[in-house]
């Protein structure tokens, strides 16, 4: 058996091929797993669990079917869907996890997260993240009418795209010291995350021992998952 990890699908109505690929994944590979972990940015945007977007209800039903089949499903918030709440989690049968979670998997101690908190060189993003994660601001935003939230979200995405276009690729990647610090804080030799859209397996030293950072790919033109078994940790790309 295996435990599966995915991230950065950025589901939206404008990308039906990705949605179809995810549905096939849920009906196939996911049903064979010991557990499924979604490490953030499942959706391109999330403005509240009360958004009547049909895509959200379709995905909730599909994930719930996996959960009901006996495969526990877990979710860590990303930078795009950090407002996904308990209502949607309940509808989809997912368990919400904190932004950093340590798992004991087949004899390995593994830290999982979305990954945006590791990009500490991007001071502008980290300041923005700290602001939008303030509980009072989230409560205020979610109390706004839905049409207002949609306008704000669209403007924020446009601003983010413009800001990122002028940033170097290095700034938007993880900071190596932040990676080592997180792994040593949790006393792990394995880290799995997404966010950067740069799939790879990196070797490093943490806790004075060899360690590994596994980065999930985004679902743009193909699927990406990490498959952890008793024998191996594999980064796998597959066609939709």
UniProtKB/Swiss-Prot annotation:
**Native species:** Escherichia coli O1:K1 / APEC
UniProtKB keywords = Cell inner membrane, Cell membrane, Hydrolase, Lipid A biosynthesis, Lipid biosynthesis, Lipid metabolism, Manganese, Membrane, Metal-binding
Reactions that this protein is recorded to catalyse: UDP-2-N,3-O-bis[(3R)-3-hydroxytetradecanoyl]-alpha-D-glucosamine + H2O = 2-N,3-O-bis[(3R)-3-hydroxytetradecanoyl]-alpha-D-glucosaminyl 1-phosphate + UMP + 2 H(+)
Q: Which SUPFAM superfamilies match?
A: Metallo-dependent phosphatases
Topology in membrane? Peripheral membrane protein
User: Any idea where this protein resides?
Assistant: Cell inner membrane
What family does the database annotate? Answer: Belongs to the LpxH family.
Protein origin, superkingdom: Bacteria
Q: Does the keyword Oxidoreductase apply?
A: no
* BP GO annotations: lipid A biosynthetic process
Q: How is the cofactor bound?
A: Binds 2 Mn(2+) ions per subunit in a binuclear metal center.
Specify the pathway: Glycolipid biosynthesis; lipid IV(A) biosynthesis; lipid IV(A) from (3R)-3-hydroxytetradecanoyl-[acyl-carrier-protein] and UDP-N-acetyl-alpha-D-glucosamine: step 4/6
Q: What is the lineage of its organism?
A: Bacteria, Pseudomonadati, Pseudomonadota, Gammaproteobacteria, Enterobacterales
One GO cellular component term of this record is:
cytoplasm
The protein's name: UDP-2,3-diacylglucosamine hydrolase
UniProt-annotated binding residues for Mn(2+) 1:
8, 10, 41, 197
The task this protein performs is described as: Hydrolyzes the pyrophosphate bond of UDP-2,3-diacylglucosamine to yield 2,3-diacylglucosamine 1-phosphate (lipid X) and UMP by catalyzing the attack of water at the alpha-P atom. Involved in the biosynthesis of lipid A, a phosphorylated glycolipid that anchors the lipopolysaccharide to the outer membrane of the cell.
Q: What is its main location?
A: membrane
- The residues that the entry says bind Mn(2+) 2 are 41, 79, 114, 195
